[in-house]
Amino acid sequence: MAQEYLDFELPIAELEAKIESLRSVASQDDEINLDDEIARLQKKSAELTKKTFANLDAWQVSKMARHPNRPYTLDYIERIFTEFEELAGDRAFADDKAIVGGLARLDGKPVMVIGHQKGRSVKDKVKRNFGMPAPEGYRKALRLMQMAERFNLPIITFIDTPGAYPGVGAEERGQSEAIARNLREMSTLKVPVICTVIGEGGSGGALAIGVGDKVNMLQYSTYSVISPEGCASILWKSAEKASTAAEVMGLTANRLKELNLIDSIIEEPLGGAHRDFDAMAHNLKQRLLDDLKELEMLDEDNLLHRRYNRLMDYGYC
């Protein structure tokens, strides 16, 4: 996968291009030793990356959440879980590829894992509908959650969508009903539910698999009722005000943690999750294991009571 860079990463990209050029020259001639120069540039690149990412604004974080190289649900499933067995279809209409899910093991423990899935190639993006589920996607997710409840399996969800698909067909098949039903049913599931925003957390399309006992966010993910561009178009009649909208929307992990709307912020590798899939997966896995250990100590009544109180606290100052 070719590395892509965002606008504020371009100075870093220039340094890394120089490093690759020197490596190429050195590999073609054994008599040329460029190790010292390469090491100097690598140190400079690391320092610049650290400085760049030390104080990203909300708009830059929004861009990071959408980074085309960012790991998706299946990337994490491959690195965190074993024996993953994908389950398909909502048993009513179709199998929506924008949501994937199935049985797996987390450190040997059986779990149900569900998440939004975007595509990499043009063909895969179309197949996955750019990570925007239709009603059948949410109904598939609910089917798997109810299956997990029957077999007393913890549920782990990964959220990464710009929003539910707003097409005519999706509306005709009951998009709003599918989302609303998921919200209701997830609030009363009798097994632990751990939700993590790994990229974009867009509106009801994200919330439909986001009601849980623990809600976490990756460091450079976002969670909001609308995109910054959409908000800017409504309030300022111009999508060019997206950066301003991002600042006032409070969509970053840090801001949502301040508001007690999420439980934990999972640190990303220097430069973002896309720089090191394995390191990011390691951090995420540890968070999931810690959360699961805590939740498994609760009996069913306490689990549901705590989840109910959590939901009732939303919106209070």
From Swiss-Prot:
InterPro entries assigned to the protein according to its UniProt record, in alphabetical order: Acetyl_CoA_COase_a_su (IPR001095), ClpP/crotonase-like_dom_sf (IPR029045), COA_CT_C (IPR011763)
Primary enzyme class: transferase
Assembly and oligomerization: Acetyl-CoA carboxylase is a heterohexamer composed of biotin carboxyl carrier protein (AccB), biotin carboxylase (AccC) and two subunits each of ACCase subunit alpha (AccA) and ACCase subunit beta (AccD).
NCBIfam families (UniProt xref): accA, AccA_sub, PRK05724.1
Disulfide-bonded cysteines: none
Broad class of where this protein is predominantly found: cytoplasm
Listed GO MF terms: acetyl-CoA carboxylase activity; ATP binding; carboxyl- or carbamoyltransferase activity
A Gene Ontology BP annotation from the UniProt entry: malonyl-CoA biosynthetic process
Protein name (database record): Acetyl-coenzyme A carboxylase carboxyl transferase subunit alpha
Pathway, per record: Lipid metabolism; malonyl-CoA biosynthesis; malonyl-CoA from acetyl-CoA: step 1/1
Enzyme Commission number: 2.1.3.15
